[in-house]
Amino acid sequence: MKLKPHHVALTVKNTEESIRWYQDKLGFQVIHRYNKHGMEITQLKLENVRLELFCYGQNTKPLPDYRKNLVDDLHVIGTKHLCIEVDNLDEKIKKLKGKEVEFIMHIDTAGFGGRYIFFKDCNGILIEIYQA
């Protein structure tokens, strides 16, 4: 049996703002939109990466403070961040800075090889870009 990731699900505070952010900053495209159980659900795709955005409108709870800091959040059980692999980290950073993305750290090297850097989306969700 073959296993492969299908999507990463993210709860967002505003569907339209989040769609625009992921389209403008990272190049994702909307592939499905629907409502179910009182929430808006949107699927986005960029090459082989799919995101599923959930929004409960005014009933959406804010991101807890401990989830806003990369180091603090690593101490808590659960999913940590979205990581997208790129061919050229320096080029991607330059493009994202040109789109007013603010990075929360300097480039670092992974213990298993490669380089990475983190930033946050418009909801404060941590995103890593990584080059092997």
Model-derived regions, located:
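Short hydrophobic/aromatic beta-strand micro-patches
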Residues: 9-11, 83-85
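Conserved beta-strand-loop-alpha-helix junction that forms the acyl-donor binding cleft
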Residues: 12-15, 36
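Conserved active-site tyrosine of GNAT-family acetyltransferases
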Residues: 18-23, 96, 124
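Short glycine-/small-residue motifs
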Residues: 129
